[in-house]
């Protein structure tokens, strides 16, 4: 019972940390990180543009920018695919099928899905998943100032649920080294750096507490 109470307290503490870190992440120049996302007039006109060189996402409705945010893209050996795609699968509480953890009783150890490691496999949380190519998607995660992912596109916890609300199955996605919006919108995008943020406790990452649920409206009229 004492162990159960201790673990429950740990989960509560880590959940508080996850939510607090999303609210108080600092941006270049100081201040808390906050993303404003505007409700589209016509959801069928929404288009997503990704600039790999700037590591920016622009969610557009014609010439209107609904949301412009920093992101993390793939490293050179595992690049984010370039080209024209569409969102075709959304999953709010997705877990990775490739890498994550093995649960060994009270121990939780990092492990790839196919590794010869004992225990029950639980994939790494990839909340607010929006898939645009097989095994590639936008999802919540730490955002770094340099390419960091295995090809997916990570959004900060402040931005991921808003992106999820803006796109739907069929939303076009254009990924290129540069985008026309780099010159007009890019300089206004807040930079965020999670590189110094500590990793959450693995025991929390294998629980439902790993998935944040936003409160309040996501999109501004």
Q: Where are the predicted features?
A:
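Bacterial N-terminal signal peptides that target proteins for export
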Residues: 1-9
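Short, structurally constrained coil/turn elements
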Residues: 16-18, 81, 167-169
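Exported/periplasmic cell-wall-interacting domains
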Residues: 22, 27, 100-221
